[in-house]
Amino acid sequence: MEEPRCLQANCFFRGKEHSIQLSVSQAVLEVEVEERRSTKRWRGHFDAASVEDLTRKTGNFKQFGIFCSMLEAALMKSSEAVSLELLTYGDLEALRCCKVGVATRVPPSTSPLSSKRYLILVYCVEFDRIHYPLPLPYIGEADMAALRRLVQEQQDELAQLRDELRRAQQEVWRLEDERLRDKAWHQQEQRRMTKELTEVKAAEKMLRAHVKTLTAELAVCRKGRSTSATAPGCPQDRRRSNSRDSRSSSQGRLPPRSPSPAGSRPPRFNPTAFVRSREQRRQEAELRRQKLPRGTVSSGDNCRRRGRRSSSAESLQSRRSAQSSGSEADTCPQRRRGLGGPSTRSPLSASSCNSTSVASHPNRGCKQHGKENLGTEPSATLSEIDARLQALQAYISTLGTHM
């Protein structure tokens, strides 16, 4: 079931204010017009058939729904194509007579037609103007008691609206105060956070400066560590130069043998010196076979065999055997000097050499001298080899004189 549509608006006709009320429900149109000052009222009911018949008589047919929409648009003044006029029966007759061209007839005041009002819906098109009249019978003035009740209701409603307005104003004032308090609090928080941000920026600046200082100090420390790491290389260079000088100056003389300092680094293996010492040992062995008697040579061979067997257990001893042979040559003159008395160098004898170097345990002596010479430089090894060669030459010359 369709709900009724109600619409009310105030309009001025001939300088007087009128209240127009429309109600549309179930294909029935109800129109009521009331004059505000005199409280006179006119009301009319129109069904869909009567409305469509009215529009057909005017020559411009409109359906009921379209006609109601046009009436609402004219009442709300939402369209310039439609408008409203309120005429009496005399005004309507005057317009008809003017259109036809005859004299106007004025109805008597006692006629019921004179009390009617006609609500005219004027529809303006481009080259035409159509009038749709709606007759509204007079229903009399409003009841005073009803008017009083209506006024009282309106006054109560007005008081209620004023009370609501007062509460709304109070709510607005409360919200305004709350907004101001929130604004003040936010401003205070903003100032505090701005101050904290300034302090944090200052602290960050100080920390950045501190980081730069620490970075510079770290760079200085690293540079100092690198220079200190490269500084010990100078004594090594000096030792190398000194070893070269001592090697050049050791030709033809036997330098005193000094024990290696404790904790020194073991010498680096020199393959050239090792090959030279091996060749020298081979030549010395050949010379000994030629000059020494058979018993002495056989004992020397046994000593060398035992030395090779002891050195074959460890590859490092073969490299140190050249150094130990030179140390044996040094020990023989020292013992000979201690037994002979004077410190002058005397030629080696076969008995003394056999008693010291051949009859003694050569492997034990080689191991001990090898341990002493672990920290010596290649220059000391070469000087010992030279001394050993000189001792062998002296020994060979001694053997030649005995034979």
Curated annotation (Swiss-Prot):
Coiled coil segments of this chain: 144-178
Region (Head domain): 1-142
Subcellular location, principal: cytoplasm
Keyword DNA-binding applies: no
Annotated spans, Disordered: 224-377
GO molecular function, one term: identical protein binding
Protein name from the UniProt record: Centrosomal protein CCDC61
Organism, as annotated: Gallus gallus (Chicken)
